[in-house]
Amino acid sequence: MPNQDILDLQPAHIRELQNRYERAMADHGYDSLLIASGAAPYRYRDDQAYVFQGFGPFLHWTGLAGQEHSWLLVRPGQKPVLWLYQPVDFWHANPVMAEEPWLEVVDVRSRQQSGAPELDSPGRLVVIGDPLVLDGVPGDHNPAALVAAVEEARVRKTPYEIECLAHANRIALAGHRAAREAFLAGDSEFGINLAYQQATGQREVEAPYHSIIGLNEHAGTLHYQYYDLKPPRRPRSLLIDAGVRYRGYCSDITRTTAGPDEPRFTALVHGLEKLQLRLCEMVSPGVDYVDIHRKAHLGIATLLSASGLVSGLADEAMVEQGITRAFFPHGIGHFLGIQVHDVAGKPTPSPEDAPFLRLTRTLEAGMVVTIEPGLYFIPSLLEPLLNGPEAQYLNRALIDELKSCGGIRIEDNVVVTAAGARNLTRECE
């Protein structure tokens, strides 16, 4: 059952979206905006379709992630109109719409046809969505400037969106607890995934992204995508990066657990968690997100030195020489919302020293970001250092000892508030 406090925020959310989208339309000279939910394409020479989760702007208004062939019309000063595709079909069931407050401020209509609805006097019409479903639809299709404005309208979350994200964190954390218990009980990656799904009540196809569940050296593959059916003989580590989708909104949480007889790796996990919490505390209006990324590298350097993995170099020198990038190759995080890697995060390119950073903006109240430092033992990144002039600073024996633990990543979902930050993940633990 949805939380009534969340439901009570729905009408104000729709009204705010109406205001934001009306401004975008006015700025670009449009009278009507039609949004397509999209549809899953079929596999080549097959009658099975790919998994479908819906177009971001459609979810922004409705939260209906699995609703194909549906359309939403936005016009200034008028109720939004939602056409839901609900065919008479004995093969499949149509989704049942619960009576909720947002339906009072949206005109919802059922229709049998999958194509775009015919509009009366739309004026200058713009249509956005997957080009595969827009063929033959009148109007301007996906103009770049209007699409950018609509994506910018998603950057600062409404109170409704923030509470949906908070609830998505609560559900996901139940899964993370179950996954940790399954690991400590000796389960396999496959079994841990089942435990996560059971605890979250979410099917794999409903997840916002494929859950990353890596034991031992698999934790060193950043987006490890397979699940071994058998557990390793010696379970040394678990890295699980997994979220849920709630009413269209995603959580994205990562936790790392050391095995019971891994004191060195346990110390690294604890050290990285302390760093991660300090980085979360940096989140505040006016802070350049790139600065958080750079502080993360200095923190990783301190941890490498304290653990004995690297010695004989100052922290700044470790960063300048690229040593920290071999241990921490990805960005510190990204925007979060309807999409896991939410839109409009890079108005400027990633800096040269952070090529994989997905967010390069100055933080503002209402933004939601992830903070996810990592420390990994990835052979393809470490071998060039171990075989180069930097080898004199690296503890090869300790690296070899920890290599089969794979790596560590710790990730929280954080709201930028007027006064600082609200950590949605930690408040639910």
Curated annotation (Swiss-Prot):
It catalyses: Xaa-L-Pro dipeptide + H2O = an L-alpha-amino acid + L-proline. Keywords: Dipeptidase, Hydrolase, Manganese, Metal-binding, Metalloprotease, Protease. Binds 2 manganese ions per subunit. InterPro entries: Creatin/AminoP/Spt16_N, Creatinase/aminopeptidase-like, PepQ_N, Pept_M24, Peptidase_M24B_aminopep-P_CS, X-Pro_dipept-like, X_Pro_dipept. One of its GO terms (biological process) is proteolysis. One of its GO terms (molecular function) is phosphoric triester hydrolase activity. Mn(2+) 2 binds at D241, D252, E411. Its cofactor is Mn(2+). The keyword Protease applies. The keyword DNA repair does not apply. Its EC number is 3.4.13.9. Signal peptide: none annotated. One of its GO terms (cellular component) is cytosol. Mn(2+) 1 binds at D252, H334, E372, E411. It comes from the Bacteria. Splits dipeptides with a prolyl residue in the C-terminal position. PANTHER family: XAA-PRO AMINOPEPTIDASE 3, XAA-PRO DIPEPTIDASE. Belongs to the peptidase M24B family. Bacterial-type prolidase subfamily. HAMAP family: X_Pro_dipeptid. This is Xaa-Pro dipeptidase.
